[in-house]
């Protein structure tokens, strides 16, 4: 992530933590870390985000025209500055959005801001700049009509989280329409779930879609989530290596082919979301997942994650194994692994707070600050499903 703005001030880790408990001893907070793991896990109890999370929110909101959540319009200057490929923008917006939902749950004073940003996130998600690859690749001009669960699953979950956070019915009709499309497509398919591109089935993208059905049920008292059992049975029977606690890379229903490589980022993403729906499922495979993929190093202070088996290389493939495992560790309440992974991920990215805004000089992946933000604030997908309504609803807006 590179910015054209000049650096005017850099806040030290100790100064950053002022006002959020006593600063940790140097041995507890390595250079390049911005808060302790204990402080991240205590945010909800304290009803306050850590100062570095507040600085991340400033990055997302503060600078006119170029902050990601400046306006509902189809301007994407923030992503251009980060050199985010068009096909990745949908994921960037979605993971920001899931973090914003947790911010709303953590701090009642920030709930209105989180809802405002979620509104902008949904609006931007519908811009053709976000979904245009579907048309460009020749798959159709309507990104939600069929398939494309890699896009419409996120959009549906974002619709639901926006209404949970704000109480607003702004997108309720669109949400109902898309939920029916997803549910009916699942019911019509001879396999459990929906493909991304034609004949490309990814379990992690389906985890988003099924979780979106649970959120819809929470809002409207329906029972779309009943489809989840058949999906979990399917992926457990056909798409997971039970000995290694890992999902295979992809499934191709027309031929029945399953790519034989297991994938850490696929598994971490999926187990994190499934834990919100069926905790026992994720808890069954989490220890085996760690044994298969996680390498602890630097005398126990750090951990990194192999993307697949048979290699010692960390973060191969799409480069997101460690970051998604950070989210999974947070979802599972695993403070030790969360701390080790953050020690591995954050310091090399050279974070700084400039004019109250967090930025990373050397982000480690295309979704680096999105996933670190999400993991730092993540209250748990089950907790989001149980989110209490806002004190004052924006009904009808």
Swiss-Prot record:
Pfam families, sorted: Ldi
Catalytic activity: (S)-linalool = beta-myrcene + H2O; (2E)-geraniol = (S)-linalool
Function: Anaerobically catalyzes the stereospecific hydration of beta-myrcene to (3S)-linalool and the isomerization of (3S)-linalool to geraniol. Is thus involved in the initial steps of the anaerobic degradation of the monoterpene beta-myrcene. Also catalyzes the reverse reactions, i.e. the isomerization of geraniol to linalool and the dehydration of linalool to myrcene. In this direction, the formation of myrcene from geraniol may be seen as a detoxification process for the monoterpene alcohol. Shows a relatively broad substrate specificity and can use various geraniol and linalool derivatives.
Pathway connected to this protein: Terpene metabolism; monoterpene degradation
Note: Requires DTT as a reducing agent for full activity in vitro.
Classification of source organism: Bacteria, Pseudomonadati, Pseudomonadota, Betaproteobacteria, Burkholderiales
Cysteine-cysteine disulfides: 74-127, 196-205
Outcome following mutation: residue 70 to F: Retains 22% of wild-type activity for the geraniol-myrcene conversion, but only 0.5% of wild-type activity for the dehydration of linalool to myrcene. Dramatic decrease in beta-myrcene hydration and geraniol isomerization
GO biological process, one term: monoterpene catabolic process
Assembly: Homotetramer. Homopentamer.
Organism, scientific name: Castellaniella defragrans (strain DSM 12143 / CCUG 39792 / 65Phen)
Name this polypeptide is given: Linalool dehydratase/isomerase
């Amino acid at each position: 992530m590179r910015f054209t703005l000049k650096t005017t001030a850099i806040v030290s880790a100790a100064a950053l933590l002022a006002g959020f408990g006593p600063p940790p001893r140097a041995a507890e907070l390595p250079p390049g870390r911005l808060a302790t793991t204990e402080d991240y896990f205590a945010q909800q109890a304290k009803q306050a985000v850590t100062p570095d999370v507040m600085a991340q929110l400033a990055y997302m909101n503060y600078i006119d025209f170029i902050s990601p959540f400046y306006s509902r319009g189809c301007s994407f200057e923030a992503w251009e500055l980060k050199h985010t490929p068009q096909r990745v923008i949908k994921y960037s917006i979605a993971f920001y959005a899931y973090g914003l939902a947790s911010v709303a749950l953590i701090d009642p004073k920030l709930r209105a801001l989180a809802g405002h940003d979620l509104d902008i996130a949904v609006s931007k998600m519908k811009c053709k700049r976000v979904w245009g690859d579907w048309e460009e690749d020749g798959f159709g001009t309507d990104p939600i009509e069929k398939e494309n669960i890699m896009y419409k699953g996120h959009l549906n979950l974002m619709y639901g989280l926006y209404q949970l956070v704000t109480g607003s019915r702004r997108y309720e009709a669109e949400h109902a329409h898309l939920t029916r499309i997803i549910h009916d497509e699942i019911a019509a398919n001879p396999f459990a779930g929906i493909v991304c591109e034609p004949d490309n089935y990814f379990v992690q993208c389906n985890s988003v879609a099924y979780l979106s059905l649970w959120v819809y049920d929470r809002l409207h008292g329906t029972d779309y989530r009943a489809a989840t059992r058949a999906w979990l049975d399917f992926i457990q029977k056909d798409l997971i290596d039970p000995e290694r606690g890992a999902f295979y890379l992809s499934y191709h229903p027309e031929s029945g082919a399953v790519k034989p490589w297991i994938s850490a980022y696929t598994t971490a993403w999926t187990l994190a979301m499934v834990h919100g729906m069926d905790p026992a499922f994720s808890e069954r495979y989490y220890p085996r997942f760690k044994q298969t993929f996680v390498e602890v190093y630097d005398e126990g202070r750090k951990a990194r994650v192999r993307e697949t088996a048979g290699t010692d290389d960390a973060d191969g493939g799409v480069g997101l194994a460690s970051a998604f495992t950070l989210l999974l560790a947070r979802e599972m309440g695993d403070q030790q692994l969360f701390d080790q992974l953050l020690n591995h991920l954050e310091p090399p990215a050279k974070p700084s707070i400039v004019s109250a805004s967090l930025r990373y000089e050397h982000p480690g992946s295309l979704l680096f600050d999105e996933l670190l933000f999400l993991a730092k604030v993540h209250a748990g997908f089950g907790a989001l499903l149980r989110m209490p309504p806002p004190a004052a609803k924006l009904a009808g807006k």
